[in-house]
């Protein structure tokens, strides 16, 4: 398939708000992709580079586009040719790699027409937001393959990504999907929680009775045991086994030889309250001397879900059954504190106890809900003391006075799941230490998509920041019609992706509640 054809599909998908029309356009594109192009094409239609980041920043891309000759006419580039070129760019390393990447990029752009260049630029910078979200694309894959959409979504959940599932489903149908199952030793994306304004609202939303568990201020982990082999993965599915020998020892001591558990690892003070999140995260650095750090900064694991236990997979089992399996596998002192109740006063007291012990709050869970890996579903609702949201930095302004020379005033946005875009909710320069200002300036400069000498610098929407605020008010200034009151930065969440940010629906729910 020609890149120009895929770029036109992307443009058409972005132009229509109708979900069914998006599915129809994507279905036709998937049919036209050659078998060896399907995984790449599906990835690009979802706005992701098939091979990951290629090491080309906004400044390099802008310079290459400015230097490129007039857009090419003629047969143009194929999807396969472009994928191969991007993989060569990504693989360039060592002395001279920057120049090598630029040569490959120049050669690619020289063969591309203007629509192809626009598509490539957005794809490389992570800005291809066309509304072809995984749910829509999953429906398109299901339509072309003649399979139930739920089966495609489940396979994508277990694979951690849709493109390999699309390739298998389109080539082999149901037999291809059957290969995607939960395997001990291979991580799956964790289930996530939506935000509720309070425990009363959470109980009402979950039907009156729910399980409430402390929301620990630690690092999310997924621990796998197969006999003596234990592997531990982070929230982002990076293997961190070497960083957490305490977790490895705990699982090896468990009475069951086959386990996949979901939980948190946290550094605790002598009184049992948590160390700051940043302190816990020191144990997860990429350059790590565990033997030196562990004695002074031990980690304690607390688990709250069982995905495999009792000899079988439990993803589809109700939450109450998964908890019962966890009780049989892990001692009480290594499970999160939990209360099953339908009494709002009892739930509020449980929340206050968690907050008094220094934890973030509670998570309310529907007792009959399955484990929906990779989804921020309505079956889990998190409640914190002060309102906080995980938002994405969209731009930053240069500071003045004491903050001169630092990118200071952050533009903050919530995710719109309908479009894949981010909806701005306001700005803040509050809550930042000098160290944070220095760090974010360098990080945001690397993400810049516009000139650094302008007073306002737009950036790729990649940094997730936890923001506290006092309330939400109507505001005609911003596209979503809402703004945060007295927003201040609590911390950056480098363990979260932009897709993990809170949604504009969550913000509207908090405003309406």
Swiss-Prot record:
Tagged with keyword Ligase: yes
Catalysed reactions, semicolon-separated: ATP + (deoxyribonucleotide)n-3'-hydroxyl + 5'-phospho-(deoxyribonucleotide)m = (deoxyribonucleotide)n+m + AMP + diphosphate
Query: Does Ligase count among this protein's keywords?
Result: yes
EC no.? 6.5.1.1
The record's listing under InterPro entries reads: ATP-dep_DNA_ligase, DNA_ligae_ATP-dep_bac/arc, DNA_ligase_ATP-dep, DNA_ligase_ATP-dep_C, DNA_ligase_ATP-dep_cent, DNA_ligase_ATP-dep_CS, DNA_ligase_ATP-dep_N, DNA_ligase_N_sf
Q: Which BP terms from GO are recorded?
A: cell division; DNA biosynthetic process; DNA recombination; DNA repair; DNA replication
Q: Which Gene Ontology MF annotations are present?
A: ATP binding; DNA binding; DNA ligase (ATP) activity; metal ion binding
Tell me its family. Belongs to the ATP-dependent DNA ligase family.
Q: What does this protein's UniProt record list under function?
A: DNA ligase that seals nicks in double-stranded DNA during DNA replication, DNA recombination and DNA repair.
Query: What name is this protein filed under?
Result: Probable DNA ligase
Query: What gene, per UniProt, encodes this protein?
Result: lig
């Amino acid at each position: 398939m020609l890149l120009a054809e895929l770029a036109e599909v992307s443009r058409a998908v972005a132009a229509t708000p109708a979900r069914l029309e998006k599915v129809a356009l994507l279905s036709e594109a998937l049919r036209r992709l050659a078998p060896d192009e399907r995984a790449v094409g599906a990835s690009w239609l979802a706005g992701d580079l098939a091979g990951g980041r290629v090491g080309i920043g906004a400044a390099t891309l802008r310079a290459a586009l400015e230097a490129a000759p007039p857009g090419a006419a003629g047969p143009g580039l194929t999807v396969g040719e472009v994928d191969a070129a991007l993989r060569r760019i990504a693989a360039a390393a060592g002395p001279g790699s920057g120049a090598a990447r630029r040569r490959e990029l120049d050669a690619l752009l020289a063969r591309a027409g203007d629509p192809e260049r626009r598509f490539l630029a957005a794809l490389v910078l992570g800005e291809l937001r066309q509304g072809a979200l995984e749910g829509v694309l999953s429906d398109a894959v299901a339509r072309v393959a003649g399979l139930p959409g739920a089966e495609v979504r489940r396979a994508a959940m277990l694979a951690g990504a849709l493109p390999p599932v699309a390739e298998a489903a389109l080539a082999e149908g149901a037999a291809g999907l059957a290969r995607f199952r939960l395997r001990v030793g291979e991580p799956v994306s964790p289930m996530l929680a939506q935000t509720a304004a309070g425990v009363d609202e959470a109980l009402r939303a979950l039907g009156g009775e729910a399980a409430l568990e402390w929301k620990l201020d630690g690092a999310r982990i997924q621990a796998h045991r197969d006999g003596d082999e234990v592997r531990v993965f982070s929230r982002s599915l990076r293997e961190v086994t070497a960083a957490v020998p305490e977790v490895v020892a705990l699982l090896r001591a468990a009475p069951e030889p086959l386990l996949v558990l979901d939980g948190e690892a946290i550094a605790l003070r002598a009184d049992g309250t948590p160390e700051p999140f940043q302190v816990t995260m020191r144990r997860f650095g990429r350059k790590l001397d565990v033997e030196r750090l562990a004695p002074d900064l031990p980690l304690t694991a607390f688990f709250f879900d069982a995905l495999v236990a009792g000899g079988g997979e439990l993803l589809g089992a109700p939450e109450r059954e998964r908890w019962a399996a966890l009780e049989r596998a892990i001692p009480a002192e290594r499970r999160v504190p939990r209360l099953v109740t339908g009494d709002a006063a009892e739930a509020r007291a449980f929340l206050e106890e968690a907050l008094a012990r220094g934890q973030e709050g509670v998570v309310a869970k529907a007792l009959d809900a399955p484990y929906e890996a990779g989804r921020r579903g309505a079956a889990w609702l998190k409640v914190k003391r002060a309102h906080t949201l995980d938002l994405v930095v969209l731009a930053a302004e240069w500071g003045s006075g004491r903050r001169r020379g630092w990118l200071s005033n952050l533009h903050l946005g919530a995710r719109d799941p309908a479009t894949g875009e981010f909806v701005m909710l306001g700005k803040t320069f509050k809550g930042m230490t000098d160290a944070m200002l220095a760090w974010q300036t360098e990080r945001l400069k690397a993400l810049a998509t516009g000139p650094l000498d302008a007073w306002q610098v737009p950036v790729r929407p990649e940094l997730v920041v936890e923001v506290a605020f006092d309330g939400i008010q109507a505001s005609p200034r911003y596209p979503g019609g809402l703004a945060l009151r007295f927003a201040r930065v609590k911390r950056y969440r480098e363990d979260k992706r932009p897709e993990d940010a809170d949604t504009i629906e969550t913000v509207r729910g908090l405003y309406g509640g």
